């Protein structure tokens, strides 16, 4: 690896599985000290800490929907590593339903995690980033923040809002050294997606069907999202701010599907 994050300190929320784990691993490989996070303290979290190295990683249990918990996460990171250079707001949840069938509880929880969770993270780290005059925040949005699929309400509403918040914060603090960007993944093969395939009557047929929908005829990998997060978080992207990058194999640009 090129050690593009040598000397940097990163917080990655929702980092014990899937895209978040791939980002945490890549950042650590590039020299960063990484604070891992999950809303549950399980064996996976401890195993990942051991993998990354206890001297260069920290695990903080926190629900991103809890503002006080996120402030504690930021404070513990600064106490341990002295600063925060990078925040990856990756933690999220899928809530897919028909609008009038959606429960009030699911509506509130979707926004609490997918939108307010990212704001809680940003609000917790921005004071220290502003004090040091530099910082990069990357929000993991979704292709659902660009295209609407029936039956997926209210997830796309939250992700559209997250992209809007990305742009607003990026503009608000650009002159003070802060960059805020987002990434919108399409279908990325994580453990959650593998479980979806496994639950289908013909898992391989469903996998092939999904791949056939993409111009490149293959599904995405978590490591590909991690590579983009690395670029946006690093000093290689100093003039990229308040924007969103789609990682969906080109599917969102197709007129017909």
Region spans (language model):
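Conserved glycine-rich cofactor-binding loop
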Residues: 9, 16-17
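Conserved glycine-rich Rossmann-like NAD(P)H-binding loop of the short-chain dehydrogenase/reductase
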Residues: 30-46
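Residue(s) in the substrate-gating loop at a strand-loop-helix junction
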Residues: 142
């Amino acid at each position: 690896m090129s050690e593009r994050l040598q000397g940097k300190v990163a917080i990655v929320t929702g980092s014990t599985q899937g895209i978040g784990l791939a980002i945490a691993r890549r950042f650590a490989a590039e020299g960063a000290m990484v604070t891992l996070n999950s809303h549950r303290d399980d064996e996976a979290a401890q195993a990942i800490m051991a993998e990354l190295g206890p001297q260069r990683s920290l695990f903080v249990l926190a629900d991103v929907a809890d503002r006080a918990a996120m402030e504690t996460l930021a404070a513990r990171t600064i106490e341990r590593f002295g600063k925060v250079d990078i925040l990856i707001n990756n933690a999220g949840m899928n809530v897919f339903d028909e609008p009038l069938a959606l429960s009030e509880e699911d509506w509130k929880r979707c926004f609490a995690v997918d939108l307010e969770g990212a704001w809680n993270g940003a609000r917790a780290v921005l004071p220290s980033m502003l004090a040091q005059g530099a910082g990069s925040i990357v929000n993991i949005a979704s292709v659902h923040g660009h295209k609407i699929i029936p039956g997926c309400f209210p997830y796309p509403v939250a992700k559209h809002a997250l992209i809007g918040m990305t742009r607003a914060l990026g503009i608000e603090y650009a002159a003070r050294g802060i960059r805020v960007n987002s990434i919108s993944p399409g279908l990325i093969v994580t453990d959650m997606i593998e479980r979806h395939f496994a639950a289908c009557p013909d898992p391989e047929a469903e996998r092939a069907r999904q791949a056939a929908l993409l111009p490149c005829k293959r599904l995405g990998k978590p490591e590909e999202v991690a590579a983009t997060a690395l670029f946006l978080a690093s000093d290689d992207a100093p003039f990229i701010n308040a924007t969103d990058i789609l990682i969906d194999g080109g599917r969102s640009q197709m007129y017909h599907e």
